[in-house]
Amino acid sequence: MGRKKIQITRIMDERNRQVTFTKRKFGLMKKAYELSVLCDCEIALIIFNSSNKLFQYASTDMDKVLLKYTEYNEPHESRTNSDIVEALNKKEHRGCDSPDPDTSYVLTPHTEEKYKKINEEFDNMMRNHKIAPGLPPQNFSMSVTVPVTSPNALSYTNPGSSLVSPSLAASSTLAESSMLSPPPATLHRNVSPGAPQRPPSTGSAGGMLSTTDLTVPNGAGNGPVGNGFVDSRASPNLIGNTGANSVGKVMPTKSPPPPGGGSVGMNSRKPDLRVVIPPSSKGMMPPLNAQRISSSQATQPLATPVVSVTTPSLPPQGLVYSAMPTAYNTDYSLTSADLSALQGFTSPGMLSLGQASAWQQHHLGQAALSSLVAGGQLSQGSNLSINTNQNINIKTEPISPPRDRMTPSGFQQQQQQQPQQQPPPQPPQPQPQPRQEMGRSPVDSLSSSSSSYDGSDREDPRGDFHSPIVLGRPPNAEDRESPSVKRMRMDTWVT
């Protein structure tokens, strides 16, 4: 709507009249200036206010303009107030446009029809783009290919990047400009944006489990802040590490690694992925076959990290997240419908699922639990936890016996997964180990929360590393309180 038109009569209020005079006087001089410049003319403006105070404006020199005026004897146009009022009345009666916009706008049937058409087009557009109203359209596919041992596809990002685990259930193919967006038919949403964040107890920035959704976006966005805490409002769907040497773990085979220097955070939409963890199973899952990676210690970018499947619903004696309530059982749900949406990885260099009969009965054989790989810097007891009540068998090729060595992804083999072979030898350490010297390879970055680690192994460079994928859970409360559950030791390395 235009400006409100006032009635052209004398203003009775003295203050209001003074304000109006000041504004309109300047407006009149501004119009005179514009006219003089646009049309190359000379203008002299003389104003006396109600108290006989003089205000004047001249485009050039007032005396020259007044001299011209007094010497001018030709017939010319001369207007007074009555002439202007008469001209304005004629314009309004003829239906011509007034210099000022009208105060009220009348809707004619033609304009109402236009508005209806615009509204219909807008509704149709919103209906067609309901899937992703704020994002580019997604190409959904039910197969996920995550090369977890390929050196060219996976690489360490710059310090400050956060770790994101690959291969979420029923996820879609990753495009370079889009994040993992699940098909809405088989996925559920379980968001607790106000859930408290739990920092690691080692004093340095370790792995942290943010709220309840699991998401794998690519590209830099809102992520962990530098003090080891995750902003639950900015990135409520992030599973990542806030340490200085975290590992960007999610790469499609054809898209480049995420840009370094920024966290792999959320873009603008949260995909509705969740993993539900049933709390009942107490047994321990068997350790799995390990894989040997033949590449030098200095140049190996990333290999399969250790996966420990524990339940956060177990009593948290001796664990880092001692404040984690048992209500987290319902926050991560991995149902059979979600699991059956994924196919197993079968090509070499990929994770392939063992078709265990227990999983086949529950239609869980197709879901790679590598979707919850928790690599990077995990503190004590902070391994990402899943309880499926079934034995899980994941095999990788070539097969080699498990060895208690650091994997190239910065983890050591979880010795608590093999209690029948090696009892935990070390006493509990109440304080975290001091940082080792700089310049070590990523292999020496972290010792896992439950492995016995000999310092002499650190000085033994090897060209091959085995990368165990261990799926298991501490069998009883003694293992949870045993010396094997200790604080992790953190080293920095130069990438």
From Swiss-Prot:
Q: Residues involved in crosslink (Glycyl lysine isopeptide (Lys-Gly) (interchain with G-Cter in SUMO))? A: K395
**Stored Pfam families:** HJURP_C, SRF-TF
Q: Which residues carry this modification: Phosphothreonine?
A: T304, T311, T407
User: Which positions does the record tag as DNA-binding?
Assistant: 58-86
Q: Where is the MADS-box domain?
A: 3-57
Which molecular function GO terms apply here? chromatin binding; DNA binding; DNA-binding transcription activator activity, RNA polymerase II-specific; DNA-binding transcription factor activity; DNA-binding transcription factor activity, RNA polymerase II-specific; DNA-binding transcription factor binding; histone acetyltransferase binding; histone deacetylase binding
> Which stretches does UniProt call biased (Low complexity)?
441-454
Name its cellular compartments.
Nucleus
Q: Which portions of the sequence form the region Required for interaction with MAPKs?
A: 266-283
- Per the record, where are the segments of Polar residues compositional bias? 382-394
Q: Where is the composition biased (Basic and acidic residues)?
A: 455-465, 476-495
Protein's recorded name: Myocyte-specific enhancer factor 2A
- The species this protein was found in: Rattus norvegicus
Q: What is the lineage of its organism?
A: Eukaryota, Metazoa, Chordata, Craniata, Vertebrata
Encoding gene, per UniProt annotation: Mef2a
